[in-house]
């Protein structure tokens, strides 16, 4: 996610993977063939027994919502994941694809996955949709057809135990995450950071995106009511879950490293 410029983090943990130095004023790294990725996602989901629902269509694109039922329904935790809301953040849909292909989901969890919320943005290699709207600022008074359709789908779903939103940050010095946990439930943040640091540097800056950070974790102290332009996470924390995480891979690193980081974080969160 784009934000204010930050000083280079001199305390960043040593890691063999280094920044590429391509991102100047925006994302200038590898891109994806989003149509091919979406086809692969649909194929992998069908192979692993997921059900698929199309909740929006535009041009030749379909917005898929995937669902996997738990082995046992009694007291099964419900988990929601999303990716690809910004068209210049390709690691998210690729991570969703790999998670589907590897199929390491907990068998007694109910999983809801929306793997690509802005496919047209990927064809343009830009953050916004075709109309220039940042979808991740459009979840309060929605103007875009994409956000309205997604919210309508979310309204039909049950409450989730927690959510994971997969993102990238073109300025980041390493992986970091946001935690929304207003009821102070057991945190998953530290275990995700511990898993990710094995495959990707962690951004240890004391200030990230203008907010205090500790060990790659941001715990915002403001409430959604204070902000007029809601990201998806604000809608989720107010309407669908009481605990959630926005995962930020550093997009000035090699694409495989970023995918590895997101996959490691998700697998750590689901290890219960």
Regions found by a protein language model. Name each.
Residues 2-272:
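Structured catalytic-domain cores with a bias toward divalent-metal coordination
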């Amino acid at each position: 996610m784009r934000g204010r410029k930050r000083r280079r983090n001199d305390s960043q943990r040593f890691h063999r993977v280094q920044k590429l130095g391509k991102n100047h004023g925006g994302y200038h790294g590898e891109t994806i063939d989003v149509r091919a990725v979406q086809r692969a996602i649909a194929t992998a989901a069908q192979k692993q027994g997921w059900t698929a629902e199309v909740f929006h269509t535009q041009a030749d694109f379909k917005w898929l919502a995937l669902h996997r039922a738990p082995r046992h329904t009694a007291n099964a935790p419900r988990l929601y994941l999303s990716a690809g809301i910004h068209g210049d953040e390709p690691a998210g849909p690729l991570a969703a694809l790999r998670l589907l292909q590897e199929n390491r989901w907990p068998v007694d969890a109910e999983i809801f996955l929306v793997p690509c919320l802005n496919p047209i943005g990927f064809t343009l290699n830009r953050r916004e949709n075709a109309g220039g709207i940042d979808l991740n600022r459009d979840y309060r008074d929605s103007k875009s057809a994409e956000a309205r359709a997604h919210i309508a789908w979310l309204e039909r779903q049950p409450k989730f135990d927690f959510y994971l939103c997969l993102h990238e940050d073109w300025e980041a010095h390493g992986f970091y995450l946001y935690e929304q946990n207003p009821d102070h439930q057991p945190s998953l943040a530290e275990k995700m950071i511990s898993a990710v640091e094995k495959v990707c540097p962690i951004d240890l800056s004391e200030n990230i995106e203008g907010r205090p950070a500790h060990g790659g974790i941001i715990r915002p102290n403001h409430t959604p009511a204070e902000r007029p332009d809601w990201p998806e996470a604000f809608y989720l924390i107010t309407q669908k879950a009481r605990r959630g995480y926005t995962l930020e891979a550093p997009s000035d690193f090699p694409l495989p490293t970023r995918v590895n980081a997101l996959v490691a974080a998700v697998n750590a969160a689901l290890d219960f």
